Amino acid sequence: MTALVGAGGKTTLMYALARRMADAGRRVVCTTTTKIFPPEDGLPVVLLEGAADPVAAVHDALSAAPCVVAAGRPLPDVRKLDGVSPRMLAVLSTALPEALFLVEADGAARKPLKAPAAHEPVLPEPLGCCVAVVGLDSVGQPLDDGHVHRSALVCAAAGQEPGSPVTPATLACLVEHPEGLFRNCPAGCRRLVFANKGDGPGALDAASEAAALSRSVAWFAGSAAQGWCVPLTAGAQRALGMEPFRDLPC
């Protein structure tokens, strides 16, 4: 399973990766351990709460479509889908080994940057890869709750004062800090950073500067909405087995 954590485009990246994998012939299950917005492009949604046999429900859906969204139940008050428990995801991934599971494991209140609270992220098991997403549009914004989710925790991780601007060093600190974006990520799990919204002015320069300060993981920058990315670190291309062209990682 692959988990997406952080802020600034997790859901968009998840669905973009899913489309790419489905186009390549894979069977893909998009899901969450928290809450997500329903897909906008007509992907089938499988509701597991109350299902007599959740494994059969997902299996049958994948037999009819290469990519599906698995969720607990609709949440009409917030126009989202409720998540699936890590325990159920373990059951599903074991029973459906041919499927690729993409799991949004974090919430960010639609902010471009965050630090996890004590109960976050809600990671599934077994976890093979964890992708931390940061929004490059956060750079230059003040570290306050109007612009950053859990800004006090970001300040603590980055050693900055409240209200000070987000910098590339802030992003690097969130990646490297033990209580940062990869909090509770298991040993042996591959760790990648996707710096999203790289189409903005100066965004790729900011991402490159952050990657240079954070050498323990592979960094990519790009635009999930536009469907491209570039590797920023020497290990990034090797980590994802991709050529250095403007495309989403697989």
Located regions from the model:
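Short amphipathic alpha-helix with an adjacent loop that forms part of the alpha/beta core around
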Residues: 55-62, 240-248
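N-terminal phosphate/diphosphate-binding loop that engages ATP/GTP or pyrophosphate donors
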Residues: 11, 18-73
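Short, ordered loop/turn segments at secondary-structure junctions
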Residues: 7-8, 33-36, 106-107, 135, ...
